[in-house]
Amino acid sequence: MKNIKKINICEVCDNSELLSVLDMGDLPLCDDLIPKNSKKICREYPTEILFCNNCYTAHHKYQVDKELLFPKSYHYRARFTADVLNGMKELVGSLIKNDGSIKGKLVLDIGCNDGSLLNEFKKNGAITIGVEPTGAYKEAENNKHKIINDYLSYEVAKNIVKDHGKMDIITFTNVFAHIDDLKSLIKSLRELIKSTTIIIIENHYLGSVLISNQFDTFYHEHPRTYSYNSFKHI
């Protein structure tokens, strides 16, 4: 099928013996929202989950192109959800409590959306940079953050370092699991970090998904669901 990549090997540890554990049939993209009176029909994509019993990572067998998942017209905005905003404020507060002042620190938020998290960093004196491929980047720019309107890649990472230097803090708030090319992501991170860089990853956890039967988190925007063991391999 066009615009789909089929996974046969674990993208974390390269194990070729993946077990099919859940098939939910064909489902539409969760953010493909259509007006009530529109005659357009949502396109559906196969939703089958593969499990790696070596590193304990769950994969979507069929991964949809990122341009379809996160187009310029992407609807989601972080600022519309009070719990999300409160969580961002708590994240920055916890960072300051544990590691001290962030005044003058270079902060990079990957998938910064409308800049809500960057706003919290900026309030506390940080120098704020974001990477955001969707139209939400304009709202972040309006709040005086430096925004790269693109998907994260090695070339984007090199340009960020060229323009600003190595990062002090890098954040992924419910974004790490959205990035399809894991090897490219890790290569990009290696370019962006120095020995003292703090990387913050907020992510749903495979253990909780299994214990609480959170199968509704297996949608196409999450090509992988990670366990603690996944990150040990990464």
Enumerate the language-model features and the residues they cover.
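Short, glycine-/aromatic-enriched active-site segment of Class I SAM-dependent methyltransferases
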Residues: 32, 201-224, 228-232
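Conserved alpha-helix/loop element of class I SAM-dependent methyltransferases that forms part
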Residues: 85-103
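Conserved class I S-adenosyl-L-methionine
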Residues: 103-113
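Class I SAM-dependent methyltransferase SAM/SAH-binding core
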Residues: 116-155
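Short amphipathic alpha-helix with an adjacent loop that forms part of the alpha/beta core around
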Residues: 155-165
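A conserved beta-strand element that flanks and buttresses the S-adenosyl-L-methionine
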Residues: 168-171
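A short glycine-rich, Lys/Arg-flanked "PGG" loop and its adjoining helix->strand segment in the class I
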Residues: 183-198
